[in-house]
Curated annotation (Swiss-Prot):
It comes from Clostridium botulinum (strain Loch Maree / Type A3). Manganese or magnesium. Binds 1 divalent metal ion per monomer in the absence of substrate. May bind a second metal ion after substrate binding. The gene is rnhB. A divalent metal cation binds at residues 89-90, 185. Residues 83-269 form the RNase H type-2 domain. Keywords: Cytoplasm, Endonuclease, Hydrolase, Manganese, Metal-binding, Nuclease. This is Ribonuclease HII. One of its GO terms (biological process) is DNA replication, removal of RNA primer. NCBIfam families: PRK00015.1-1, PRK00015.1-3. It is found in: Cytoplasm. It is an enzyme of class 3 (hydrolase).
Length: 269
C-alpha cells in the first residue's frame, strides 16, 4: 500500500494493511515498518495514530523476542561455534499414568538471525497451540532429533529415577548424528559416553534444551490424547495422566488402567 497520500486512505484499509504487516512480518522488513509507523503517527486522525502506536508496540515486542532468542542461541554457542550440540529434556516424570518421554535435538546454531526459531522457551510457558506450531518448525529445521520413551510397566519395575535417566540416554543415543556435547536440564545424564553439561533451569537458557522440551511435551500430550479415546473415563486428553482430582476420583471408581503406574498409586488404592 502506498501511504504517500495517507489522508485519502480510509481507516479500515489502513487497519487491514497494519494487521497484514503483523501477520507477515519478517526481520528484513524492520526499517520499512519503522517508516510506516512514522507516517501513521503524523496522521491527524486519532484512530490512525493508535494503529501506529500499536504497530510500534508490536515492533518493540519483536525486538525483545529477537534479543531473547539470540541470547538462547548464544548461550549454546559459547560452548564452541563448530560443535554439534544436543539439548535433551524429559516430560512425564510425575504423572500417575503413561510413559516418561524425552527428546534430544541438535540445531544449527550458526544460522543467520532471520533463520532462527523464535518464541522458543520452556514448554510449560507456551500455549498448546504455540507448542504444536513450534514442534513442526523445530523438526523441520533441526539437524537431527530423536524421541524416546520408557513405559509405565518399566517405571514400576525399575523406578522413576532409573527410568528418567534411561529415557534421556536413549533420546541422545538415538540421534542420527553424534553430538560433541549434550546439554541437559537440571542434572547430568549418567552413563552417557558423550561430554555432558547440565544447566540449572536449562529450558529457559538453552535454545537446544528448550527445543527438546517442546518436542517431548507435544509428543507425550498427543500420545495421552490417543489413550483417552480408549480410556476416556480418566480424562487423559486434558490431564495428560497427572493426578488431578478428577483423575484420582476416576481411579477410585474404575480402578487403574493398563497404562497406570501402580507404584504411584499406593496412596490412592
Amino acid at each position: 500500500m502506498n501511504l504517500n497520500n495517507l489522508e485519502n486512505i480510509r481507516y479500515n484499509e489502513i487497519k487491514e494493511f497494519s494487521d497484514k504487516i503483523k501477520k507477515e512480518f519478517t526481520f528484513s522488513q524492520e526499517k520499512q515498518v519503522m517508516d510506516i509507523i512514522e507516517k501513521l503517527n503524523k496522521d491527524p486522525r486519532k484512530n490512525v495514530i493508535k494503529l501506529g502506536q500499536a504497530l510500534e508496540k508490536f515492533l518493540n515486542k519483536y525486538e525483545e523476542e529477537l534479543k531473547r532468542t539470540n541470547n538462547m542461541y548464544n548461550f549454546d554457542r559459547r560452548y564452541g561455534n563448530n560443535y554439534l550440540i544436543a539439548g535433551v529434556d524429559e516430560v512425564g516424570r510425575g504423572p500417575l499414568a503413561g510413559p516418561i518421554v524425552a527428546a534430544a535435538v541438535v540445531l544449527d546454531l550458526n544460522v543467520e538471525e532471520m533463520q532462527r526459531i523464535f518464541n522458543i522457551k520452556d514448554s510449560k510457558k507456551l500455549s498448546e497451540k504455540k507448542r504444536e506450531e513450534l514442534d513442526i518448525i523445530i523438526r523441520e529445521k533441526a539437524i537431527s532429533y530423536n524421541i524416546a520413551l520408557v513405559d509405565n510397566k518399566t517405571i514400576d519395575e525399575r523406578g522413576i529415577s532409573w527410568s528418567n535417566n534411561e529415557v534421556l540416554k536413549r533420546a541422545v543415543e538415538g540421534l542420527k548424528v553424534k553430538p560433541d556435547l549434550v546439554l541437559s536440564d537440571g542434572y547430568a545424564v549418567k552413563n552417557l559416553n558423550i561430554r555432558n553439561e547440565f544447566i540449572i533451569k536449562g529450558d529457559s537458557k538453552s535454545i537446544s534444551i528448550a527445543s527438546s522440551s517442546i518436542i517431548a511435551k507435544v509428543y507425550r500430550d498427543n500420545m495421552m490424547k490417543e489413550y483417552s479415546k480408549e480410556l476416556n473415563m480418566y480424562g487423559f486428553n486434558h490431564n495428560a495422566g497427572y493426578g488431578t482430582e478428577e483423575h484420582v476420583q476416576a481411579i477410585k471408581k474404575y480402578g487403574p488402567s493398563k497404562i497406570h503406574r501402580m507404584s504411584f498409586l499406593t496412596n490412592i488404592l
